[in-house]
Amino acid sequence: MIPRLRPCIGWPELLALCMPARKGAVPEFERGFAALMEQGYAAAFPYGRTGLACLLEALGIRDKEIICPAWTCVVVPHAIVYSGNEPVFVDSRPEDYNMDLEAAEREITARTGAIIPTSLFGHPVDLDCLAGLRARHPGLPVIQDCAHSFAASWNGKPVQKEGIAAVFGLNISKLITSIFGGMVTTDDAALARELCRVREYTISPASWRKEWKNRLYLPAAAMALYPPVYGAINTLERMGSLNRFVKYYDEVAIDMPKDWQEGMGAVQAAVGIRQLTRYADIITRRRGTAAFYHKQLAGLPDIKLPPWAEGATWSHYTIRVKKREELLRQALRQGIQLGWLVEYNIPDMAAYRNRPGFRDCPAARMLAREAVNLPMWGGGLLKIADFFRSHIVYQHSN
């Protein structure tokens, strides 16, 4: 079966798991990550959401409203709440999947502490529109959510540099991975020092248990997502037997992982250091895969293709269809797993429905209902394209 995702890891990463934990690996990873993102400083965290919560603390933002997209990963508002602030949700633009910045500007009040644009699925935020907002509100911190996008660019401008800081995720579904983990980057030296100070009293060192768990987790995940094996794994996943490993949110709860305050370990950093050398090749391959899909699926009825931007990094290739469940079922019958990441509109979730930042976001609701993610790791592309041509044309003619 063709899995919906597969981390780009090889022998260098697996060999890193067999080496003794090396003191200084985390700072080395931070320096390498900052250089890759063309920023002055980077700070590693156990999760991107932990980094966001600590960043808001370092900025002195508390008891404020934080503007964020309604259609994004739910861990973002979770981190906002854990930081002592309140998320205010803004609808999305169907044409580029990202937060409607004009609508976001209308939400700015005296209580607004920051705004978090997200380059969802690797599609860059419209930096021209954002520049106008920043000019009209020069004191408002902009935090770029680059968990999906990393170094995506808008008209040649790197998104991650257009704000006070940027937040990245590093689990195995991301463009590059440190098994688990997150990173915050900035060009502001004073903020970097304060962020590290906050981390010092908020985050405990990684335990030996965490280090060993990560040594085992990465090869296990790589094997589970190996196509000849994945059919059996997918059966267990659909039965709910793997929920503790694959389900990252609870519809009714605002929570964080149990180890959200246990720092990144040296084993994770060692894997991350090796991943940095792969980044350019990973992005080149994903752009090639996206171009393949864009060409092969063009003109098919009942499918809306994602927006095309030259600077996109394509963490996901996300189409829109009206009959998503039928498409997913038919694909599974053909040995293809399609994804539906961000299958929720956050304000509609029970955990947020009655909070002060609730807003009705119809576009986000529609996108959450229609979005389908195609496998981007590069395997089975011809089979996937053939499936779409045969299935969509057949459905359209009946």
Protein language model regions, located:
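Conserved PLP-binding active-site segment in aminotransferase class I/II-type PLP enzymes
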Residues: 1-62, 83, 108, 255, ...
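PLP-dependent aminotransferase-like
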Residues: 57-153
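Conserved active-site segment immediately N-terminal to the catalytic lysine
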Residues: 144-178, 193
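PLP-dependent aminotransferase class I/II
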Residues: 27-32, 36-43, 115-118, 127, ...
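Structural preference for beta-strand elements that scaffold enzyme active sites
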Residues: 141-143, 165, 371-373
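Short beta-strand-to-turn element immediately C-terminal to the catalytic PLP-Schiff-base lysine
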Residues: 168-169, 183-188, 219
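A short alpha/beta connector and helix-capping loop motif
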Residues: 98-104, 156-166, 383, 387-393
